[in-house]
Each structure stands twice: as structure tokens, then as C-alpha cells.
Amino acid sequence: NSLEKAADKGELYIDLVTYTVMDMGLDAMSSKYYTKDHSYLNHYRVGGVKLVLDGSPQGKTAWLTKPYLEPPSGKDDSYRGYPKFSKEDAEKFINQAFQNQWQLLAHTNGDAAVDEFLFYINGALENYGYDEHRSVIIHGQVIRKDQIQKIADLNVLASEYAAHTFYWGDWHLNSVLGSPRAEYISPTRDLIDAGINVTSHSDCPVIPPNSLRIID
């Protein structure tokens, strides 16, 4: 890839970490830039793998356990979004990450997607161990309160997208989720209080990479 080529030429001046999307190929995991000790080579390393398990709440493609407040055009009132993968494929990818001891990031916006991720992580831990897996929920905007202790128990991290509400908060309240779900988006305080390691992000280019807005 272009970053590997730049690293090969010594053209990188800051440390960069990338994660390879599992269903798009795993060549990066056999690269010299992936090492078990997480060391950088020429300011670059491959950190692990990523899965995208659902879509976005603002686009009404996040996978929810309860229907959207207002379904998108062409969908009935029972519409809850949808998963990206079959159950078999989701389980296969998560097991593969644990079997190889690759750190796994999972784009999981909806609470149904979070349920799926946690379920298969629990199974992978039973099958392969890897207690220090440090798997990460990416976004986790519609995490339910009852999921938080499970996240903590499984040693899963959460990278929250709290700045999202600055741009789409009204849309979530009035069309996507309604109250009370929209008022519990990205429950960062509850995650921290449960002892879960939390980060925050901009998801650039979805929103601008404004570090102050992320922590505002």
C-alpha cells in the first residue's frame, strides 16, 4: 500500500498505525510492518485488523434491536437496520483474529451490532484464550446501559464518537432514534465509570479532524 511504500522510502515523519479490513484481504498481516511487539519501522506499523459490522445511525443503516423512529423510504415500521455479514462470516472473522492474536477493531454503531460483537468475542475467548486481546468497539453510538458491564467483563475497549451529536443530534432525536435512545448516544461517562478504557475520535473525513471539538 502507499503508506508501506512511503515507509520503505523513509518519507514518514510521524508515527502511523493502520488496521487492515479483514474482508478486503490480509496481506498486511504478513508484512514486515506487523510485529507482535507493536514496534514501528520507519515510523509505520500495522496494528491489527478491522471489521465493519453495520452502518451508520444518521444513514439509518446501523443495526438496532428496536426499530428506527422514522424508517427510511421503502421500509416499514419494523425496520431496524441490518448486519453487514452473515452470522457465520462474523464468527469466522472474529475467531480468526483471536486465533492469530491480532488486535481487532469493529465498527459497531447499533446495539444489535454490539451484541453480535460481544457474543462472538466471548466464544473466541473460550476457544482461543488471548486475554490481552484489547478488541475495540468503534463508534458504539447506540450502546445500551445493560451492555456496559459485559463490555468491561470481556476486556473490550471503546472508541466513542461523541462529537457526532454536534452535527446530527437533532436528527437522531427527531427522526433516527427518538427519546430516550438519542439522549444516551455515546455513553462515555458510564463506560469510564465501569472501568472501560475509552478513546474518542473524529472519524475524519465524516466530520473535520478538530481535536478540540472531540473533547468539547
Residue ranges and their predicted role:
Residues 85-90, 139, 143, 183:
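Secondary-structure capping and boundary motifs in well-ordered enzyme cores
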Residues 23-28, 138-145:
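Active-site glycine- and acidic-residue-rich loops that bind
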Residues 18, 136-138:
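Short, hydrophobic beta-strand segments that form beta-sheet elements in well-ordered domains
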Residues 80, 138, 205:
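Short, flexible active-site loop motifs that bind/organize anionic cofactors or intermediates
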Residues 95-105, 112-135, 145-153, 157-216:
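His/Asp/Glu-enriched, well-ordered alpha-helical/loop segment
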Residues 51, 142, 196:
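Residue-level marker of positions within ordered structural domains that often coincide
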Residues 2-111, 150-157, 163, 202, ...:
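Metal-coordinating catalytic core of metallo-dependent amide/deamination hydrolases
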